[in-house]
Regions:
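Structural signal for short hydrophobic segments within the conserved structured cores
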Residues: 1, 48-50, 82-86
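N-terminal leader/targeting and pre-domain segments
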Residues: 1-22, 96-104
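Thiol-based oxidoreductase modules, predominantly thioredoxin-like and allied folds used
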Residues: 3-7, 25-27, 38, 45-61, ...
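Short amphipathic alpha-helix with an adjacent loop that forms part of the alpha/beta core around
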Residues: 12-16, 60-66
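Ordered hydrophobic segments in well-structured contexts
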Residues: 22-24, 50-52, 75-76, 84
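Short cysteine clusters
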Residues: 31-34
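Residues at alpha-helix caps and immediate loop-helix transition turns in enzyme cores, especially N-
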Residues: 36-37, 90
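Non-catalytic, surface beta->alpha helical segment in thiol-disulfide oxidoreductase systems
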Residues: 70-104
Length: 104
């Protein structure tokens, strides 16, 4: 799902996703590592992916406040725990991060 406004982002943040990890993936359509990361994330059945476009000016203040300068960038949330990472991670690395996130 693509998030196009801050209101949509806030609404999604307030939804109870149960046992699923919520991943906000920030990137662009032209970014090859972003596409690769998307494909890797889609292999996980226990996450929900929301995409945000780095070039969407609506989010510029959000990106600045959160010091998001590079893509791909992900904000992963599980219950009250937040994990962030930038760049491309392997499937195994993501699996380890998601397991750790659930145990925290």
């Amino acid at each position: 799902m693509i998030i196009k406004t801050l209101e949509e982002y806030n609404n999604v943040n307030s939804i109870d996703h149960g046992e699923k990890i919520v991943v906000f993936k920030i990137g662009t359509e032209w970014c090859e590592p972003c596409k690769t990361l998307q494909t890797t994330l889609e292999k996980f059945d226990d996450i929900v992916i929301y995409n945000m476009d780095m070039e969407n000016e609506v989010f510029q203040s959000f990106y600045e406040e959160n010091h998001i300068l590079n893509i791909p960038y992900c904000i992963c949330k599980y219950e009250n725990v937040v994990f962030r990472f930038k760049g491309l991670l392997s499937e195994e690395s993501l699996k380890d991060k998601f397991t750790f996130l659930r145990l925290t």
